[in-house]
C-alpha cells in the first residue's frame, strides 16, 4: 500500500475544492471514511477513451494521490489515479459543477484533442503529445 504522506500531493492533476466537498458528502452518505475517489481512463466511448469515477478503499503502489482540503478547512479527501491513467490526466482539472444541466463531476483535460458532447469520452493526438 502507498505511503499517505501529504508530501505526495505534488501531482499536476488539479482537484477543486468543490469536487472535494462533493466527494466528502458522498463518502459521508456511504458511512465509510476509508473511501477515496478513483479517476481512471479506459478504452471505449464514442471518442476512443472514457473517464471513470469510482470509490476505492485500496491505494495501490503505483497510484498518484492528490489530497484536497475541503472548504470547511478541517477535512480532506484523496483522489487516486493509476499510473496508466495518469499519463492522460496530467495537467487536468477535476471539478464539480452545478448548472442548468444539473450537477456533475467534470474533467477539463488539456490532453484531449476532441471530446464527446456528453463530456465523458475523449480522444488524444499522437502518443508523442503526452
Swiss-Prot record:
Needed co-factor(s): iron-sulfur cluster
Positions that bind iron-sulfur cluster: 46, 116, 118
Keyword annotations from UniProtKB, A to Z: Iron, Iron-sulfur, Metal-binding
PROSITE patterns linked: HESB
Cofactor descriptive note: Binds 1 iron-sulfur cluster per subunit.
One term of GO molecular function: 4 iron, 4 sulfur cluster binding
Top-level taxon of origin: Bacteria
Gene Ontology biological process terms, A to Z: iron-sulfur cluster assembly
Matching InterPro entries: FeS_biogenesis (IPR000361), FeS_cluster_insertion (IPR016092), FeS_cluster_insertion_CS (IPR017870), FeS_cluster_insertion_RrpA (IPR023063), HesB-like_dom_sf (IPR035903)
Pfam family, one: Fe-S_biosyn
Record's subunit section: Homodimer.
Reported function: Required for insertion of 4Fe-4S clusters for at least IspG.
Family listed: Belongs to the HesB/IscA family.
The protein, known as: Iron-sulfur cluster insertion protein ErpA
Name of encoding gene: erpA
